[in-house]
């Protein structure tokens, strides 16, 4: 999953990977729904955290 992305992603890359807007990606990080690291003034998301978010989101979908 997400093989074409680096091991540590920017918020912009996360938005692209999830096909959501940049504001929505920041909202996921700010609400702690998506684990992220602050490196200086930048926010970085380790790929395993993005994959975990997607797995968790899939399990929470109600049909």
How would you describe each model-predicted region?
Residues 1-24:
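Polyanion-binding surface elements
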Residues 41, 49-50:
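A generic "binding-loop/recognition-motif" signal
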Residues 50-63:
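A short, Lys/Arg-enriched interface patch at domain edges and termini
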Residues 22, 47, 54:
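Short amphipathic alpha-helical/adjacent loop interface patches that line ligand
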Residues 18-44:
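Major-groove DNA-recognition helix of helix-turn-helix-type DNA-binding domains
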Residues 10, 44-45:
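Serine/threonine-rich, low-complexity intrinsically disordered segments
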Residues 14, 33, 58-60:
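Extended rod-forming repeat segments used as scaffolds/tethers
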């Amino acid at each position: 999953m997400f093989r074409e992305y680096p091991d540590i992603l920017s918020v912009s890359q996360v938005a692209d990977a999830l096909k959501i807007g940049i504001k929505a990606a920041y909202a996921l990080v700010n609400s702690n729904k998506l684990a992220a690291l602050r490196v200086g003034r930048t926010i970085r998301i380790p790929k395993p955290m993005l994959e975990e978010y997607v797995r968790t989101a899939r399990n929470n979908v109600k049909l």
